[in-house]
A protein has these predicted regions:
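N-terminal loops that bind phosphate or other acidic moieties
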Residues: 1-207
Length: 207
């Protein structure tokens, strides 16, 4: 990925596209969560992201760094469950790490995501291999540092979500199931992969 200047229109496109992609898969995400969690991941994510869409004009009127922080606050306040604080932390950390010149490349995105992963580890008291969204974000972060293409990163995110299926959950509600959590995709891994795939597709179309 070369240099990318984040404009208000591009930010709006990314936020809207990502929100709509997850909302469209809300029932699937809830079905995944019914197997190993509270059964509300899709419902909660849909509620939070519908609030983001409803406030999109105000959000995208802000500089990108502040816009991401606003998205994060909305996710914390509106999503509920475990996902709200986690996705809120992700968005707010990305906003905190955002470059002052609004110019992005793979290396900078990799640094921003690395900081977000560390923040998520602290917030969720989880690490890699615990069958969470971290198991998608970490390989994506490595792919960014390696300057992989958007198509490659999208495929890596999809594969990483699928790789949570044989894992045993050791964090969150799914961990109560022990070995019975094996054989199911983690809902948070699925939703984060879906977001990354959507962002990659939109950025590829813009390049």
């Amino acid at each position: 990925m070369g240099k990318l200047q984040m404009t208000p229109d591009l930010l709006r496109s990314l936020l809207q596209g990502t929100a709509e992609a997850v909302i469209a898969q809300a029932e699937h995400l809830t079905a995944l969560d019914q197997a190993i969690g509270d059964g509300d991941h899709g419902i909660n994510m849909k509620r939070g992201l519908e609030n983001v869409l409803a406030d999109l004009d105000n959000i995208t009127a802000k500089p990108p760094a502040e816009a991401l922080k606003a998205v994060g606050m909305t996710m914390v306040m509106k999503v509920g469950g475990a996902s709200g604080p986690l996705y809120g932390t992700l968005a707010m950390t990305l906003g905190k790490e955002w470059p002052t010149d609004d110019e992005l490349d793979s290396a900078k995105l990799g640094q921003m995501l690395a900081a977000s992963i560390e923040a998520l580890k602290k917030r969720g008291k989880a690490d890699l291999g615990a069958k969470t969204m971290l198991d998608v974000l970490a390989p994506v972060q490595q792919a960014l540092e390696a300057n992989k293409s958007m198509a490659e990163i999208s495929a890596i995110a999809k594969q990483a979500a699928e790789a949570t299926i044989p894992m045993k959950a050791t964090r969150g509600r799914a961990s109560f199931l022990g070995d019975r959590s094996i054989g199911h995709m983690d809902p948070g891994a699925c939703s984060s992969a879906l977001m990354i795939q959507t962002i990659c597709q939109l950025l590829e179309e813009k390049s």
